[in-house]
Each structure stands twice: as structure tokens, then as C-alpha cells.
């Protein structure tokens, strides 16, 4: 049991280190877009983008804490969406449908953003029609369910399974597998990610976590 516990601590440390990495591609592309806006005298949008980038990194760092409030996690997701909507010239819309009673509960930071990133890069990027991303948050008994839904190109069942099993080695951020691993390590096998997708219809990612009151996060 001691060896098993040490392995869990080691894996948690590895996942924290991955989480702390700044995605250089995303940062470069965002700064490039801000520079272009400034050159076009579009200072209003440039200021909004800089503000979103600052908030994104402030929440990402969050004093080195692993857990943040769901409210902050959603602000992190929204900051990412603001940046990408400018970069993608409004090729997609996004909306939040959130049960406000869950906002004060705690969750692992940077849980939602990797799935939004996946939706944009793999689901919406090559679409002809306007893309749509919905983030839905609900209570479900003793748990909280976060849904990231898109109307993108979709995937086969095999591709869904591959995403959940494949480690990310291209330094473009936290992989879906890492998020799933993290949730299972912290909370057990009943928690984590499920992906449902249909080609040319879209993808729905469901993230299941326990309800954690502020102060209880130290128990994990």
C-alpha cells in the first residue's frame, strides 16, 4: 500500500508539472494577434485580448494551488474563448448555461479549457458553417457535471477512445488523457471524462467531479 500511495503522489506531481507548462504556441499566436491589432489601430480589441490573456494566466497560476472555485475555472475558460474568438475572427459563438449554486464549489484548475481547445482545433477549425460551443454546468446528486458541447465535425467512437488513451507529447497544452487521469487519481474511477460524438453532428464531453466545499480540497 505504501508503494501504491507513493506512485499516486508521484503521478499527481507529474500531472501538476504538465499543468504548469505554458503553451508556447498559444502564447506566440495570441501575442502575434495583439501586435496585428495594434498595427491596425484596433486598440479596443487589443486591450480586451490582453485583459483576457492576463486573466487566463493569473487563474492558471493561482498561487500554485491545485484547486480553484468553479467560478474561477469558468472565468479561465471564458478568457480562453475570448482570445480564440478574436484569433478565429468570430468563426464560432459560445455560451454558458451554469447552475449558479455550484459556483462556490472547488475543482481541479484547467479542467475545462483542454476540451474547448479540442473543440476548436479538431471540431470547428475546418467547418464551413458557424461553429458553436456550449458549456453547461449542473448539480447531479453528490456530484457536479460539466458539459462541453460543440456542433463540429465530430469523431468516430474509435477516435473518442484514442483521445482518452493518448498522451500528449507535442507541448501544445494539457492533453485530454491527462485531465481524465488527474480526476481519477484525485477522486476515484467513478469520476472523469466521457466523450460522445457523431460525425458531422458534433461532440459532447461530460466531466464528472464530486461536490467539494471550500476547505475540503485539502482532503484530496
Model-identified regions with their sequence ranges:
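Compact Cys/His-rich metal-coordination microdomains
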Residues: 191-194, 215-220
